[in-house]
Amino acid sequence: MRWTPPPASTAIRRASSDGQSPAVWYIAGVSDENRFEEPLERLRVRIAELGQNPESPARDKAIRKLSARLEKISAEIYSNLTPWQKTLVARHPARPFTLDYVRVLLRDFVELHGDRTYADDPAIVAGFGVLGERTVAVVGHQKGRDTKEKIRRNFGMPRPEGYRKALRVMKLAEKFRRPVLTFIDTPGAYPGIESEERGVSEAIAVNLLEMSRLGVPIVATVTGEGGSGGALGIGVTDVILMLEHSVYSVISPEGCAAILWKDQARAREAAEAMRMTAADCKALGVADEVIPEPPGGAHSNPLATIDAVGRALVRHLDRLSSLPTETLLEARYAKFRRLGAWEGTAASR
């Protein structure tokens, strides 16, 4: 498998404020909100440093000891994350993005560009490739890693042409009877004036309609943030998978706190109330399956994460591909009709 690691987002540096006090270890790139990750980053960097030393029994023993400690602490921390901490993990810049899944899982991938109406949108990647022995269409949000790419990808926030490009590729998949895979990881659709002028709400609405009746299997995977309509625009699918530490919500916790309490500092409280974690979404019937992440999150072992997602995708495609189109569409309709239904309402019957 091929995996291109992102530029180091964290690094431990030695600093001394007065030249006399002992050197202080600090982690560059870890915000105060993300301090729960700090012990893990220290251990990872120490293991990497030891790995650069000449081979010796003592070095190997030290690496094994630190690795065991890292695994233990990772399991302890990540099994007790709050919804707000899971939100921060979902936004981690080293988590695999759509193109990382494409590079590892697919062969002969051909990316298609443009919506044939206005322009291309780099915030959404779309094309065709081969998963196992099956040709599939892939549509997914793509965030950037460095500043230049983040700007080019618009931080993973699609404009209307991105959703129209996505639909163009999905309609091609339907024409050639190929299943569709979508990868969701966005803070939301871009809300700028030019986006509104070109009809972002209409573009998303059309995608919801067309995906609801697309005559081929569709599987979505929420790999990081599932942000509001920006996620839904490629999220009307037969199966919705969520990585363990991904989130799916109608608005960000910060946005919710700003609207309800006029105070973004209450984002932690909002995250608790919104029930946006993968476990919550599974319990509510929004997600069909939660894919476990390695101890320490997807960013700690991207290849293992991508492999787990690939296995789940193949399993669901095998099942969905055996269904008649009419059965597939009826089940898709029933799935979304049940969402938000309470006992006693017509939709719950």
Please annotate each region the language model reported.
Residues 43, 82, 138, 185, ...:
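Terminal peptide-recognition signature
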Residues 87-90, 151-155, 296-299:
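Short hinge/gating elements
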Residues 5-24:
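Short amphipathic, helix-prone segments within low-complexity/disordered or flexible regions
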Residues 22-135, 303-349:
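Intrinsically disordered, low-complexity segments enriched in small/flexible residues
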Residues 115-116, 126-128, 168-172, 207-211, ...:
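A generic local secondary-structure boundary/capping motif
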Residues 108, 120, 126, 131-183, ...:
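Glycine-rich beta-alpha loop segments
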Residues 184-314, 318, 322:
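Conserved catalytic cores of soluble enzyme domains
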